[in-house]
Amino acid sequence: MRAEIISVGDELLRGQRVNTNAAVIARMLSAIGVSVSHIVACSDDEADIMATCSAALGRAEVVLVTGGLGPTRDDRTKHAIQQLLGRGTVLDEASYRRIEERMAARGSAVTPLLREQAVVIEGSHVIINSRGTAAGMLLDCGEPFAHHHLILMPGVPVEMEAMMHEGVIPFLTSLSNSVICQTPLKIVGVGETAIAAMLVEIEDAMPPATMLAYLPHTAGVDLMVSSRGNSREAVEAEHQQVVDAIMERVGTLVYATREISLEEVIGEMLLRQTFTVAVAESCTGGLLASRFTDISGASTYFQQGFVVYSNEAKERALGVPHETLVAHGAVSEEVAQGMALGCLEKSGADFALATTGIAGPTGGTPEKPLGTLCYAIAVKGGGVVVCRKVVMQGTREQRKVRFSTAVLREFWMLLKEREASEE
């Protein structure tokens, strides 16, 4: 099954908003074996919407449109599709009742503009909007687009994503008899080119129905293994064979085979081992602490964080010796060790992670170029167990992400070794 995604909105074409909806939809479609052939951004002009949707329906069996279903004058998608299909509109009573209940809970009445949110194109299968007011619509288009489907959803990301999960994906799955298996392999600290070089022979030998996608990101690359066919048993067996071969080659670099962040995996490991952690940060400016505390329940294992940007703060808050700072400079392995030990002592945690470096774009020297990172990990009762100096490329923002990821990856490896030694 082939699909196209159309995102409606002048704000997308002006660069005022990033089109995140299309990426989310494409990922969800890929997971059920639906191929996306085009992703298009379209203006709010009715003629443009009609022309764009007409062209898409001529190429794809399913066209998903987001945006233009709201209550304002620039929300023209519904009227444009009415014109394209030659249909009228009706009030969807169930959607209207939900709007009434939502407004009553706020002590407000339903305005004419809000009522319009429950008006749908004739012949629509209504997609419930569990997060907002604008009803979604699933349309069997009829001639000249017989057996082609048009799906209309709001442009608000949280509303669109809920509709995809609750209405669109179940519908599209029912149209397909094919079986698809997907396994993500999550990797940080190693780039796409290096991983690809390790997997050349495996890719050359892969069955035609199995694909390997490389999804590079700031801190590394994720792999997605996808297999498709008509027999579940055969597809699953073929898929697992390829995954096993890849894991045999690069498995030590893979921190997870499910959709989960590195910090979430570390959190799970800390919970299993009943350990706690604290961080002392200079160049990462609190990003490490933020990544830990982005996870619900992190208070169980995350003790505290220190952001010590100046030399005085490193001395005052963590007890880094003045002599060490003078002799080696703030960006040095010696200072990273002092920060980790001070953090361990002040926090009482089982582990302390420390970062100091030069994120740029200024501050580099021949001896300590831009992108230099010094980091250390200290363990209660064991002192400093990891201390490294590396140089990383990128913008200031990219380096901060890569710096924090480098430390987290090192911490993950340390925890993994400890788990293995206790088995």
UniProtKB/Swiss-Prot annotation:
It holds the Pfam family CinA_KH. It comes from the Bacteria. This is CinA-like protein. Coiled coil: none annotated. InterPro entries: CinA, CinA-like_C, CinA_C, CinA_KH, Competence-induced_CinA, MoaB/Mog-like_dom_sf, MoaB/Mog_dom. Belongs to the CinA family. Disulfide bonds: none annotated. Transmembrane segments: none annotated. It comes from Chlorobium chlorochromatii (strain CaD3).
